[in-house]
Amino acid sequence: MKLLEGKVAVVTGAARGIGKAIALKFAQEGANIAFTDLVIDENGLATQAEIEALGVKAKGYASNAANFEETHNVVAEIVKDFGRIDILVNNAGITKDGLMMRMSEGQWDAVLNVNLKSAFNFIHACTPVMMKQRAGSIINMSSVVGVHGNAGQANYS
């Protein structure tokens, strides 16, 4: 039996990049995968097909993770489609680099909304599901920039 056989993992921001790699690894370990991204375009459909080729159930959901209501709606849809949520990986993230003196409030807010608020939104939506199951794991991704800092990334770190 594989490590995550029969589990359902939700990975945010997983149509490509690190999120996709996480989704694929969890699928290799037997987890069914629900993943989100701002849009499910050809990248998202390719990711879904790649995950399904590993013999597990997979579905991509278009979702603005920074929107509280939309996040709750997509989590309800995931539970309807998969029956449960065992693992949540808060991976969604963006960068909008710039020196503080040149950074707009919009740039600041965009990064914090996706990188921080989205984690709150998904935890808030998934926690009742996990509590009802009496089990669940939440993984919050972050960057080394939060520890070491980087010029132009005050909003990211």
What are these regions (language model features)?
Residues 3-34:
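Canonical Rossmann dinucleotide-binding motif of NAD(H)/NADP(H)-dependent dehydrogenases/reductases
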Residues 31-46:
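Conserved glycine-rich Rossmann-like NAD(P)H-binding loop of the short-chain dehydrogenase/reductase
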Residues 41, 62-74, 105:
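The beta1-alpha1 cofactor-binding region of Rossmann-like NAD(H)/NADP(H)-dependent oxidoreductases
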Residues 54-57, 77-88, 96, 107, ...:
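A glycine-rich helix->loop->beta "capping" turn
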Residues 99-100, 107-112:
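Substrate-binding pocket helix/loop in short-chain dehydrogenase/reductase
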Residues 123-124:
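A short, exposed helix-loop element centered on a Lys and neighboring polar residues
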Residues 143:
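Residue(s) in the substrate-gating loop at a strand-loop-helix junction
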